[in-house]
Structures are given as structure tokens and as C-alpha cells.
Amino acid sequence: MSASGGKIDHLGIAVRSIDQALEFYRDQLGLAVSLRETVDVEKVHAAMLPVGESRIELLEAAQPDSVIAKFIDKRGEGLHHVALTVPDLNAAVERLKAAGARLLNEPRAGAGGHLYVFIHPASTGGVLMELIQE
């Protein structure tokens, strides 16, 4: 997988309440919310806050059986994933599969309608990674 053209798109942070988290990120750090939406396929509410050329994504469980609810129950609030952009998501997925990487989903539309895939932490040295089509 080539990093050429890619960048760190966002850091996903699991929170119990986006509204409470915004008291810090917006009110204390001065970051503005550029997008707020519910991502039904992941059962989460999301808020994007630009930071330079990247973003912070605050993630709140929309349902008790969501991945974010389970993450918070097990680990508490905090860093959930690192998201990178790639110029060709399908080619990246094929390279990852050929190398034996464990993917958590096939490419699908998520926040902002962008195609994405998650890579299991067992394949990345312990970090949940998300790849997003540029």
C-alpha cells in the first residue's frame, strides 16, 4: 500500500456523549464542528472537528449494541481508531487480503458518504485502522 497521496484523515475518539465532549473540544480548544450526523450502518452519532489538514471524529453510540457502546463498556472513552486516506480503496483491500490482513468489513459508505474499511488491530500492531477512499 502506497502512502503517496494519502494522509491521516481523522482520529476517531469514542465518547459517552458528543455534547459533553464538545464542552472540551469546542469550548476549551476552540475547534468548530464541520459535520454532525448519524451513521446508521455503524449505529453511531458522529461529529467531525477539523484540525489543520486532519480531523477529530467524536463517536457516540446510537444504540446499546453498537461497536462504540461495546468499546466504551470494555475500555472506557478514548482513542478508538486512526483513519488514513488511500487513492484506491479497492486496490488497497486486495493488497491487504493478499498479505493476510484481517479486515472487519468490506468497503461500504460511512460518515460523509465516503467508502471505508476497518483493519483489525491484530494485523496492524494493536491499532484499529480505517482506510478511506480519497
Regions found by a protein language model. Give the residues of each.
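Short strand-coil-strand connectors
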Residues: R16, P50-G52
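Conserved active-site tyrosine of GNAT-family acetyltransferases
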Residues: A21-R26, L49, L96
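Hydrophobic aliphatic residue packing
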Residues: I13-V15, V44, I68, V86-L89, ...
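A cross-kingdom feature marking solvent-exposed beta-strand/loop segments within repeated
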Residues: A3, K7-D9, L31-V44, Q63-H80, ...
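N-terminal beta-strand motif that seeds the catalytic metal site of vicinal oxygen chelate
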Residues: M1-L22, E77-V86, E134
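Short loop/beta submotifs within extracellular cysteine-rich repeat domains
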Residues: A21, L29-A32, R55-I56, P64-V67, ...
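Vicinal oxygen chelate
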Residues: S2-S4, A47-M48, E57, L84, ...
